[in-house]
């Protein structure tokens, strides 16, 4: 894996409603500084209560929220803009794919944990947290930070409602999939998956069946739709092999 894939960055559990609140502030047209101040005020009674530590839990969580929807990496600004455009006419309960996609694109570590979890679901129907953490450590190195951050991501999965406690004590089961019917949203979500992948490239068949997208049931997408987005390059090597690559931002 390239260096970006080995970077963790995701060092707190981000609740879905916090992302919704962040997005509401973005849609209200607030400046970055005002959004940051508003998040500090809204989270003061939930995280680092009574503390003003510069790198406490509240500040680290706000950093994650800001990086996901406000101060995104330059290479992902067009992706963010397209995601916000897709929000028009959607309700809060329909934002899950957008939050998942941006989080995955900004933090590839999220995709790694999602891939491992999704594969376990396909193999055995459930996923034990210890098995997920062990596999992620095998991929990214035997570091305590890797296991700890994997736990943060799994807790976020639970908070977002994409995994549930199974009958087997301590294991997780997948929640019913979220239907993605709008082809524009489906293409955007697949672009997020491509941009989170090593070298921002993926085989088409692997992409549309990506275990890291296990929370979603995406309506059929064909390679031509990805190419038409203007953000993805589609190269057909043979009848059996089609490669999808993210175009570099201008």
Language-model segment annotations:
Residues 166-246:
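Accessory, usually C-terminal, subdomains that scaffold auxiliary metal cofactors
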Residues 1-104, 115-116, 127:
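Eukaryotic partner-binding/assembly regions in large regulatory complexes
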Residues 42, 59, 63-65, 150-161, ...:
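Basic amphipathic alpha-helical segments that dock to polyanions
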Residues 35, 39-40, 123-138, 198-211:
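Short acidic, hydrophobic short linear motifs in intrinsically disordered regions
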Residues 114-125, 129-177:
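Eukaryote-skewed repeat-based solenoidal scaffolds used as protein-protein interaction platforms
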Residues 6, 246-250:
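Long, low-complexity, charge-rich intrinsically disordered regions
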Residues 19-26, 100-126, 182-202:
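Positively charged, polyanion-binding regions of nucleic-acid-associated proteins
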Residues 45-53, 134-145, 205-219:
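Short helix-coil junctions and helix-kink-helix linkers
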């Amino acid at each position: 894996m390239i260096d970006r894939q080995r970077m963790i960055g995701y060092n707190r559990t981000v609740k879905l409603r916090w992302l919704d609140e962040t997005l509401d502030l973005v849609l209200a047209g607030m400046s970055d500084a005002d959004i940051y101040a508003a998040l500090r005020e809204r989270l003061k009674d939930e995280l680092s209560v009574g503390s003003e530590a510069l790198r406490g839990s509240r500040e680290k969580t706000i950093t994650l929220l800001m990086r996901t929807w406000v101060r995104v990496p330059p290479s992902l600004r067009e992706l963010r803009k397209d995601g916000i455009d897709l929000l028009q006419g959607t309700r809060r309960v329909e934002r899950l794919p957008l939050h998942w996609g941006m989080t995955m694109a900004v933090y590839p570590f999220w995709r790694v944990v999602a891939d491992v979890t999704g594969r376990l679901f396909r193999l055995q129907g459930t996923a034990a947290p210890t098995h997920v953490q062990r596999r992620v450590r095998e991929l990214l190195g035997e570091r305590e930070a890797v296991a700890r951050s994997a736990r943060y991501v799994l807790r976020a999965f639970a908070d977002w409602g994409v995994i549930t406690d199974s009958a087997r004590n301590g294991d997780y089961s997948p929640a019913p999939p979220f239907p993605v019917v709008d082809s524009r949203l489906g293409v955007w979500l697949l672009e997020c998956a491509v941009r989170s992948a090593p070298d921002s490239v993926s085989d088409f068949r692997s992409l549309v069946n990506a275990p890291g997208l296990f929370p979603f049931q995406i309506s059929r997408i064909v390679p031509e739709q990805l190419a038409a987005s203007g953000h993805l390059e589609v190269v057909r090597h043979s009848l059996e092999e089609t490669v999808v690559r993210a175009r570099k931002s201008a």
